[in-house]
Amino acid sequence: MSSFRKKNAKFWAEVFDLLVFLILVFWIVLFIRLFIATPYTVIWSSMAPNFHQKDWIIVEKITQRFGTFERGDVIVFVAPWKTSPYIKRIIWLPWETVLFQDWGVYICSDNIPAWSLIKDSDWNNCELLPEPYLLEWLKTNAVCGKEEFKVKSGYFVMWDNRWRTTDSLCCFGIQCYDWANYVVPDNYLIGKVRVRLYPTYTKF
């Protein structure tokens, strides 16, 4: 009887240890996913040729809270009028003015007064944005009836597949009411894509 009680006590002690371990693992994983990094699956072909449908990616969340996003960063966010996460690339930053011209993106200084009538001399203040991540036939053209933008706050983001139109260029597929509809506010950002796990391991 004594031996049975010892075995029974040992069994329940092991069960308790296992439960404690599982609870600890659960909270560690939850903390990591909420505050450090979380996995996502790419569901669209809009970031081709750099990301494809069913790619597994890891999104780092620390930059969103403590760091700074840079031009060219690939981010995951929830669009202001959508519920599912998007993956897109930051093209320009707060308080920048940009121009779409000749299938290119130009970053221009703020001292150009009239964006609707850009003169030849004004091009001295504009710089063509190099985009080595794009295929030649996916270069940018102005769509949705607008060729110039002033980003007051938030981030202007675009697909790498520029033939898709549900990005900042077209207010994520809804009607554009003012400049705020074109950008992603800070509080909608989830994080920066750091790693692709599948089908090929790639760091960004």
State where each predicted segment sits.
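Soluble "head" domains of membrane/secretory-pathway proteins
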Residues: 2-16, 20, 35, 41, ...
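A short acidic/basic microdomain associated with nuclease active sites
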Residues: 44
